[in-house]
Amino acid sequence: MPAHLLQEEISSSYTTTTTITAPPSKVLQNGGGKLEKTPLYLEEDIRPEMRDDIYDPTYQDKEGPKPKLEYVWRNIILMGLLHLGALYGITLIPTCKIYTFLWVLFYYMMSALGITAGVHRLWSHRTYKARLPLRVFLIIANTMAFQNDVFEWSRDHRAHHKFSETDADPHNSRRGFFFSHVGWLLVRKHPAVREKGATLDLSDLRAEKLVMFQRRYYKPGVLLLCFILPTLVPWYLWGETFQNSLFFATLLRYAVVLNATWLVNSAAHMYGYRPYDKTINPRENILVSLGAVGEGFHNYHHTFPYDYSASEYRWHINFTTFFIDCMAAIGLAYDRKKVSKAAALARMKRTGEESCKSG
């Protein structure tokens, strides 16, 4: 939505949200709807410190032959071995102890929140603010997930939003399901990804000591938190077999977290409906949201990347929003940005798929 259509309702309490509400009534009437005027319209974005996650429709791929794919054989081999180990882990499920299942569930949710509430909604999009204890928790959880450090993940994700479905999009879904799911990690980046990624403003990430600390010590952190700890805890504390601890609690769990995240890039860009903006590829996909703890409302998210819920409906199939709201209730999260129902409905009427329009 253009910046001049945004309105900010400012609250002095850190436990409330900053609401992006309705555009001017004349705009709504042009779109077929009517809403009352609101008292204040801002000329700037709801997040004046952030611009580079807003879709740029003016960017077009360069004409000419596409560069030849360069395979990264190290990644191909490691991903292959990981998924073979995960498949073997499936066969061990009947022999695992109940405490191991609970441990895997705990580690899955921690890893998922490190991606969704952490690197995605906090650091990539700055949709809310977090106090130091919460940021430390999320940086640890993000390291447990092992999906690149916060700096690199955020850079790629901002490029994905700004140059979506072009060669400058790191996991461009127009290159097919496999490429957008995992293939983009198995080949060298397209030159356009490097070129346009270098133009993004990442000063907020560079200025955050915690983010740069993680980046500096990422390899030993991942070795400890993604592989050693989840293997040793069940083996040492409740006598799980080392085989089950390694292949089920570690490799299978890690592979499932990876694929749940990847489905947001692949399935949620191809399968589902587009109630908010039919001109973009991202879709609403409930199944993806189940696995990715709330990240499947993707048409909404690409339309309103500044909404901390990444969804119109807050807690509906969205554990991440529930978690952030709990953190706000105890004072660890604040300044949550939320698009109002009026603004979402206005956008739906203007650009949504006809079958999704209502009211």
From Swiss-Prot:
InterPro entries: Acyl-CoA_DS, FADS-1_CS
Cytoplasmic side stretches: 1-72, 119-217, 264-359
The keyword Membrane belongs to this UniProt entry's keyword annotation: yes
Residues annotated for substrate binding in this entry: N75, N148, R155, D156, R188, K189, W262
Segments passing through the bilayer: 73-93, 98-118, 218-237, 242-263
GO MF entries: iron ion binding; oxidoreductase activity; palmitoyl-CoA 9-desaturase activity; stearoyl-CoA 9-desaturase activity
Keywords, comma-separated and alphabetical: Endoplasmic reticulum, Fatty acid biosynthesis, Fatty acid metabolism, Iron, Lipid biosynthesis, Lipid metabolism, Membrane, Metal-binding, Oxidoreductase, Phosphoprotein, Transmembrane, Transmembrane helix
Name this protein carries in UniProt: Stearoyl-CoA desaturase
Organism: Capra hircus
Gene name per UniProt: SCD
